[in-house]
């Protein structure tokens, strides 16, 4: 169970957050906010999955809620890089 928690609930959202942050930092114009929005959409998908699949197994519900929180907190970094002005 600890490997599941470490990999699925922490490592995967951190890697996705880093990739979205790099994409937000390198993009231009209004598309700079799109990676942050994508992370929020992923958190909403994990929340919906937690509520629908969590009826049969409580561990799936708890894992989905942790994943929702991790994605939601991690979406702040792409928004930060997307809304920050580029320095020349």
From Swiss-Prot:
As for subcellular location, the record says: Cell membrane
Q: Which residues cross the membrane?
A: 3-23, 33-53, 61-81
Q: Which UniProt keywords apply?
A: Cell membrane, Membrane, Transmembrane, Transmembrane helix
| Domain of life of the organism encoding this protein | Bacteria
Q: What do the Gene Ontology cellular component annotations say?
A: plasma membrane
Q: Does the keyword Transmembrane helix apply?
A: yes
Primary location recorded for the protein, binned into one broad class: membrane
Record membrane topology: Multi-pass membrane protein
This chain's protein is named Uncharacterized membrane protein YdzK
Species this protein is from:
Bacillus subtilis (strain 168)
From the broadest rank down, the organism's phylogenetic lineage runs:
Bacteria, Bacillati, Bacillota, Bacilli, Bacillales
What's the gene? ydzK
């Amino acid at each position: 169970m600890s490997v599941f928690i470490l990999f699925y609930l922490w490592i995967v959202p951190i890697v996705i957050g880093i990739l979205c942050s790099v994409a937000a930092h390198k993009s231009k114009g209004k598309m700079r906010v799109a990676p942050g929005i994508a992370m929020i959409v992923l958190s909403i998908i994990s929340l919906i999955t937690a509520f629908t699949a969590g009826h049969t197994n409580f561990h799936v519900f708890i894992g989905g809620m942790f994943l929702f929180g991790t994605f939601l907190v991690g979406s702040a970094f792409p928004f930060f890089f997307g809304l920050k002005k580029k320095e020349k």
